[in-house]
Amino acid sequence: MVEIVKAYVVATVKRGKEHEAAQKIRKMEEVTEVLVTYGLYDVVVRVEAKSLGHLDKIVTDIRQMVEIQQTSTLVGAQ
């Protein structure tokens, strides 16, 4: 049985680029939800990955976007 790795990625984004970053992130297949937020983080992303290695690739792809300044990843405990 394949167990999906569920995680949340929270990110700070360059000022004024929150919605642009969210639109780019929404296009990623593994992303199930993206919220632009107020507070410490600008964007919250819900991800479902096939493995921890797959999650690592997804997070790396998000971090490489020019709008993204910093991320933190919260991996769900089953």
What are the roles of these predicted feature ranges?
Residues 1-78:
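A compositional/biophysical signature of low hydrophobicity enriched in polar/charged and small residues
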